[in-house]
Amino acid sequence: MKRSNVYDSENEKKLHYKNVKNYFKKSAADKCGFYELKSEEKLERELKKRSMWKVYTSTLNEILKSDLNISNGIDVACGMGNFTRELSKHKRFQNIIGIDFLKETFDIAIKTKNKFLNTSFFQGDLLNLPFKDSSFELTVCLNTLHHIHKNDFLKAIYELSRVTKKYLMIEIRNKNYIFYSWKTKIVLPRLYKDLPIYSNSIFKLNKLMEKNNFKLKILRGNSVISFSSWRLVAVYEKF
C-alpha cells in the first residue's frame, strides 16, 4: 500500500473514532440520571423490553450453569453498566470489572455504586486492554464490535481473547443476515447517519477464534435461525 493511502486510511479511522466518541458523549448526556431516577423494579422492566436483553441474560445463565467455578469477569465497553450490573447480581462473582473508553458513560453507574456489587469501573481502550493474559474467567463484550473500525477488528478480537481465561461472550452484527442489503443501505443510515456500522461473518469469526484457541460453545440471535440473525451473541470456550 502506498504511503498516501496508508495516511488516508489512518485519518479516516481517526475520524471514525472521533464520531463514535461524540455519539456516545451525547448519549451519556441524555441518560445522566438513568439509575438514580429508577427503582429496581422499574429498571428491570425497562431492560427486559430491550430487543436483545433476553438473549443476553439467558446466554449468561447458560454459561454460569455449565461452569460453577467462574468467580470473576469483565464487561468490556461496558457503557453505563447495564450488563455489568447484571453480572453483579450473581453473587458468585467476587470481582467484576467494567471498562469503557468514555468516562462520561460509566460515571452514570458510579453515581449509584450500591447497585453494583463487587464491581470496579475503569477507563480504557478495547484495543489495548490494561490487563495480563488470562486475567478473567468470563469476558463479555456486547453491542460494541460494530463500532470498531474494520481495520481494527482482528486486534479487538485478539485483545478480548488474550485477557480471557475460560469464556468469551461477544456480539456482532452479522454479514450473513438474510436482509443484509436492506438493513445496511436503508435502515442503518437513518439511525446512525454518518456513523458507519461494521458487520462481520460469524463463520469467519469462528475460524479466527479457533486460531486463538477458542471453540464455539453457544450461538444465539434475535431471530429463530440464529446464524442468519442480524444481531448475534456468540460464546467461545478456551481449549
Residue ranges and their predicted role:
Residues 1-70, 80-128, 148, 152, ...:
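Class I (Rossmann-like) S-adenosyl-L-methionine-dependent methyltransferase catalytic domain
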Residues 77:
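Conserved S-adenosyl-L-methionine
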Residues 93, 136, 164-165:
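Short, well-ordered alpha-helix to beta-strand connector turns
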Residues 131-134:
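Short amphipathic alpha-helix with an adjacent loop that forms part of the alpha/beta core around
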Residues 140:
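A conserved beta-strand element that flanks and buttresses the S-adenosyl-L-methionine
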Residues 143-147:
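Short catalytic micro-motifs in class I SAM-dependent methyltransferases
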Residues 154-166:
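A short glycine-rich, Lys/Arg-flanked "PGG" loop and its adjoining helix->strand segment in the class I
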